[in-house]
């Protein structure tokens, strides 16, 4: 894929889920209009549970009011999951038409990015046939849920949402749900496997490098992005 245009990237720190969602939608419109390059957003969220487009409340192990974090229905694919501190979130805003990628090829590349990132921490991870995400044995270490949309009045097919990689996140949050709707599999993290967790921002740097390699892009930092409510903690 040599010759692809550069991809912008930004580390945003900790951002409320609703604010990050609004930012993605704005950037996706700008990308589809040709006003912005492909962009990789890297961040953490405060504790929040999210579901995909279909109702996944049957995968709650506790009543919603006992979760201890908000529950948000989104427009991505996939089932219920948790996001919180100690988890690296990556939201690529990419025009798949210009990249000449199908949706499943795109997802497979995201898995490859995660697997390569984990090798930086001496973790050998892989995929399980028929399931999305990245696994270490029978335990999921990274979830993927994406949306490919065509913003109104534009010709592009632009991605939003993305991946969540468990670095040092408190795995107790996952015990309150059937994570990703898969009852017979567990979850793990870099901390669980290595005994210690690197800073999430360090993992973000490693993932950015691997993203550039897998997608054949030069990665260019963005100094600032306007975030609604400006709730980022850097």
Model region roles, listed by residue range:
Residues 53-61, 70, 144-167, 171:
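Short, conserved beta-strand/beta-arch hydrophobic-aromatic motifs that form part
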Residues 152-154, 164, 169-234:
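C-terminal accessory segment of soluble enzyme catalytic cores
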Residues 1-141, 172, 176, 197-198, ...:
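N-terminal lobe of the biotin/lipoate ligase/transferase fold
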Residues 87, 160, 185-187:
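Short, solvent-exposed beta-strand edge segments and adjacent coil->beta transition regions
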Residues 90-92, 132, 144, 163-167, ...:
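A structural signal for short, well-ordered beta-strand segments
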Residues 28-32, 148, 211:
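Generic secondary-structure transition motif, activating predominantly at the C-termini of alpha-helices
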């Amino acid at each position: 894929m040599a010759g692809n245009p550069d991809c912008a990237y930004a580390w945003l720190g900790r951002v409320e889920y609703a604010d990050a969602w609004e930012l993605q939608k704005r950037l996706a419109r700008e990308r589809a209009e040709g006003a912005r390059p492909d962009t990789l957003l890297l961040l953490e969220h405060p504790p929040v549970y999210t579901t995909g487009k279909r109702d996944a409340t049957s995968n709650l192990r506790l009543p919603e009011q006992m979760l201890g974090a908000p529950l948000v229905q989104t427009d991505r694919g996939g089932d219920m999951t948790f996001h919180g501190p100690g988890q690296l979130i990556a939201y690529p805003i990419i025009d798949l038409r210009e990249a000449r990628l199908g949706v499943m090829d795109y997802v497979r590349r995201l898995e490859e990015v995660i697997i390569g990132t984990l090798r930086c921490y001496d973790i050998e991870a892989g995929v399980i046939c028929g399931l999305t995400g990245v696994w270490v044995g029978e335990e999921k270490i990274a979830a993927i849920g994406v949306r490919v949309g065509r913003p109104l009045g534009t010709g592009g097919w632009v991605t939003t949402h993305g991946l969540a990689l468990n670095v040092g996140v408190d795995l107790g949050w996952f015990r309150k749900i059937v994570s990703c709707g898969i009852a017979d599999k567990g979850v793990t993290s870099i901390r669980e496997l290595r005994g210690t967790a690197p800073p999430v921002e360090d993992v973000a740097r490693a993932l950015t490098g691997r993203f550039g390699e897998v997608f054949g892009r030069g990665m260019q930092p963005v100094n600032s992005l306007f975030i609604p409510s400006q709730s980022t903690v850097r």
